Amino acid sequence: AESSAMKFERQHVDSGGSSSSNANYCNEMMKKREMTKDRCKPVNTFVHEPLAEVQAVCSQRNVSCKNGQTNCYQSYSSMHITECRLTSGSKFPNCSYRTSQAQKSIIVACEGKPYVPVHFDNSV
């Protein structure tokens, strides 16, 4: 079975990628990374930084998660990210996404040994 850490990588890390010149980025990636298999995942963020840098956030600024848990961490620096949002009127299996890029600090929930990201909480 896929571990939480592996699922995080599949859903949120695209180190070499960029959506800068590709308005279709989210449509392609959401499908490729299997987030449109049984439903259209409504919102998803991809981080275009090396995996090691994303994992390192687990030792950065400790903050509260949206759900009140205390195992969230905010990156000290802003990261190159792409936010994918389902367009209104889009219906499974024809999932259609709006692609927008940003430079933001990311907030992830971490757990396990090694202590690694398992959930993408927010970007600020």
Swiss-Prot record:
Q: Which UniProt keywords apply?
A: Disulfide bond, Endonuclease, Hydrolase, Lyase, Nuclease, Secreted
Q: Cystine bridges: which residues?
A: 26-84, 40-95, 58-110, 65-72
Which top class of enzyme applies to this chain?
A: lyase
Annotated EC: 4.6.1.18
The UniProt entry annotates the active site at 12, 119
Q: Residues that bind substrate, according to the entry?
A: 7, 10, 41-45, 66, 85
Q: Report which superkingdom the organism of origin falls in.
A: Eukaryota
Record InterPro entries: RNaseA, RNaseA-like_dom_sf, RNaseA_AS, RNaseA_domain
**Cellular compartment(s):** Secreted
GO MF annotations in UniProt: lyase activity; nucleic acid binding; ribonuclease A activity
SUPFAM superfamilies registered for this protein in UniProt: RNase A-like (SSF54076)
Mind telling me which PANTHER family this protein's record contains? RIBONUCLEASE, RIBONUCLEASE PANCREATIC
Protein family per UniProt: Belongs to the pancreatic ribonuclease family.
Q: What is this protein called?
A: Ribonuclease pancreatic A
